[in-house]
Swiss-Prot record:
It holds the Pfam family Ribosomal_L29. CDD domains: Ribosomal_L29_HIP (cd00427). This is Large ribosomal subunit protein uL29. HAMAP family: Ribosomal_uL29. One of its GO terms (biological process) is translation. The lineage of its organism: Bacteria, Bacillati, Bacillota, Bacilli, Lactobacillales. The gene is rpmC.
Length: 68
């Protein structure tokens, strides 16, 4: 993700409620699980997507802690 995309993503997150953030986090965790499974099976083409999803989850957790 480019810096502009990251800023847009974080701004979007800040507009969400706690429940919506939790839902988005769960979706990304499921995607991360699927990506890890594909990587273990040797079927993953976009290996950079793993790190991107991890960082998005961390951004969500950061916004959640800001709200609290």
């Amino acid at each position: 993700m480019k810096l502009e995309e990251i800023k847009k993503f974080v701004a979007e997150l800040r507009g969400l409620s706690q429940e919506e953030l939790a839902k988005k986090e769960n979706e990304l965790k499921k995607e991360l699980f699927d990506l890890r499974f594909q990587a273990a099976a040797g079927q993953l083409d976009q290996t950079a997507r793993l790190n991107e999803v991890k960082k998005q989850i961390a951004r969500i957790k950061t916004v959640q802690s800001e709200i609290k």
